[in-house]
Every structure is written in structure tokens, then in C-alpha cells.
A protein has these predicted regions:
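Periplasmic-binding protein-like
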Residues: 87, 150-159, 196-222, 256-258, ...
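Extracytoplasmic ligand-binding site segments that recognize negatively charged/polar headgroups
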Residues: 1-4, 38-178
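A bilobed periplasmic-binding-protein/Venus flytrap-type ligand-binding module shared by bacterial periplasmic
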Residues: 92-97, 134-138, 213-227, 243, ...
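Early extracytoplasmic/lumenal segment of secretory-pathway proteins
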Residues: 1-53
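A ligand-binding cleft/hinge motif common to bilobed small-molecule-binding domains
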Residues: 49-52, 178, 183-201
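Conserved C-terminal helix/tail region of periplasmic/extracytoplasmic solute-binding proteins
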Residues: 275-304
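Mature extracytoplasmic/periplasmic domains
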Residues: 219-282
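Paired acidic/hydrophobic, glycine-rich loop segments that form the ligand-binding mouth/hinge
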Residues: 40-44, 166, 183-188, 203
Length: 304
């Protein structure tokens, strides 16, 4: 979707060619910058990696003289990064198993394997899972942060034996649902809409989802900082933002994009008012401080 709605139109308009290198990997970014051999000029990272990258001195500060932030939501603007799109991690389910309305609607129900039996998949990462574990343990949405990590791990201990696959790429949970290998999943909302378009019998539940965003960052030592800055300035404007959202229902980071977004796409976005109010907004600062320790703990926990 990015290639069609952003990269190609930007190339056509400016003559600046964008060469994609995938996937984004924080470890690789760190190694590049620290070795002085920076191959990437611009990187699409999760919101937490902006905080981590700034802390690790891996990023160039953005030039906000050249980037017009009019209409951009304040929480996605950072000295070292700016939002690309909003997305949600949600509870997804097989509509073959669950007719509309009788699927789990909370993480407590996802955890309830007696009432909702069946194979499950969750992300192989503490991100998202710890929030969902607290919600499953009846922590109110507005009290999730700062997280009670011990309580979260006690809660996730209970679901661990019932998770058939710990997914590592965004495409995986949607594919597992489409193939009928699992009946319940945590997934990024756009991936579920994509398989629905292809006819897969899958649905998603916005309630207790986790709302977050991706960001553009420029690695320290980028060889084409000017080109990267031009792309960021272009891509955060209303029309490019609307173009990507009309293609796949993520949320624009620029409020002015709503003028150019179709009614159906607007309803399906994670930031649609009815959807956003039922979700937890990520706290990147909290994760930026605790992430490394929790990833180590998670990896050890998974092996137990």
C-alpha cells in the first residue's frame, strides 16, 4: 500500500527515487549507525523505536522548518520522528467458528478457554501482550500504565499453554486465521481487513484494542538526509495521508486528511471516534524506559 499510495506518487512528483529495503529491524539500524555504514536514509519504525533510537543516539533530529506539521496529531510529533499512520492491535477471530456477535469481546474472554475453546495465536513479544494480560485480569483501560509487570506475567502464565503459535511477522496471524489453523488471534487491524477483502472468514473486535502508530525516522549518518526530509514533509500532508487510508484502513496522522477519506474507510479506521474510545493508547515513554529488560524477560519466560 505504501508503494502505490506514497512512494510512486512522490517519485513522480519530485523525481527522487525510493528504493525499498525490507523489513525494518532495530538491531540492524543500531549496527549500521554504530559501525558508520548507514545504508538506509529513512526508516519506518514503531512508536517505541523513536524513543529507543533517540536514547541510543541513532537518529537525526528532524528539520521542522522543512516539515509542515499543521493538522498533525501532537502525540506523533517527536524531535527524532513523526507519525506515518495509526494502527491497532486487536482481538481477531474466525467468523466460521463465531457467527457475528458471539465471539470473545474482551481479553478476559480470550483468556477463558473453557467458554471459548480453540487454537490461538499471539505475538512473540511483550509489546501488546502485557497490556492485554492486565486487561484480561480486569485492570481498567485507564489504569494499564504504568504497568504492573508482575501481575501481567502472572496473567499471561494462564494463557500460555493454550497459545499454539507465537507469531513474529504481521502477516502471520491473519494467514493462520485465513487457513483455519487458529480461531482466535491478536493481529494488526489492517491485516484482517486485507484478508477479508480476499474472502477470508475473519473478523476483528475493536473493544480493548491497543492504538499505536508507526513513525518515520532518519538514521544518524544518513547519506541523503535532504531527500528523506522532503519525503517526510510530503507524506504527512493531507492528500498522501488520505490516499494510504483509502487503500487500507489505518488511521491518518494528519487530521486534515479526513476531508479526502471515503465514509466507509473512515468508519473502519482505528482512529474513528467509536473505535478509538474503546481502546488503550500506547505509552511510548513507558515502553522506551522498560522495553529492553522486558524483551529479555519475555524471551526467558517463553523458554520455561
Amino acid at each position: 500500500a505504501q508503494r502505490k499510495t506514497m512512494f510512486q506518487p512522490f517519485e513522480k512528483e519530485t523525481g527522487i527515487k525510493i528504493v525499498e529495503a525490507s523489513p525494518t529491524d532495530y538491531g540492524k539500524l543500531k549496527a549500521m549507525v554504530q559501525s558508520g555504514n548507514v545504508e538506509w536514509d529513512l526508516v519506518d519504525v514503531g512508536d517505541l523505536n523513536v524513543v529507543a533510537g533517540a536514547k541510543d543516539n541513532l537518529l537525526e533530529p528532524l528539520d521542522y522548518q522543512a516539515i509542515d506539521t499543521k493538522g498533525v496529531f501532537p502525540q506523533v510529533i517527536h524531535k527524532y520522528g513523526i507519525g506515518t499512520i495509526y494502527y491497532s492491535t486487536v482481538l481477531a477471530y474466525s467468523t466460521k467458528k463465531y457467527a457475528k456477535g458471539d465471539h470473545p469481546k474482551t481479553w478476559a474472554q480470550f483468556w477463558d478457554v473453557g467458554k471459548f475453546p480453540g487454537p490461538r495465536t499471539m505475538r512473540n513479544n511483550p509489546l501488546d501482550n502485557l497490556e492485554f494480560a492486565l486487561l484480561a485480569d480486569d485492570v481498567p483501560m485507564d489504569k494499564v500504565y504504568p504497568m504492573d509487570v508482575e501481575r501481567a506475567f502472572r496473567s499471561i502464565d494462564r494463557i500460555k499453554p493454550h497459545v499454539n503459535v507465537w507469531w513474529t511477522t504481521g502477516a502471520q496471524p491473519a494467514q493462520l486465521l485465513a487457513d483455519g489453523e487458529v480461531e482466535l488471534a491478536t493481529s494488526w487491524n489492517g491485516r484482517i481487513f486485507a484478508i477479508q477483502k480476499q474472502g477470508a472468514r475473519a473478523g476483528l473486535e475493536w473493544n480493548q484494542g491497543k492504538l499505536q502508530w508507526d513513525s518515520w525516522v532518519i538514521p544518524r549518518g544518513s547519506k541523503n538526509k535532504d531527500g528523506a526530509t522532503k519525503f517526510i514533509a510530503w507524506s504527512t500532508q493531507p492528500k498522501p495521508q488520505a490516499a494510504i487510508v483509502n487503500e487500507i484502513p489505518y488511521g491518518p496522522v494528519n487530521q486534515r486528511a479526513f476531508e479526502f477519506i471515503g465514509a466507509q474507510a473512515a468508519r473502519d479506521m482505528p482512529t474513528a471516534p467509536d473505535n478509538a474510545k474503546r481502546q488503550v493508547m500506547v505509552d511510548p515513554a513507558w515502553w522506551g524506559e522498560h522495553r529492553n529488560v522486558l524483551v529479555e524477560r519475555w524471551n526467558a519466560w517463553l523458554l520455561k
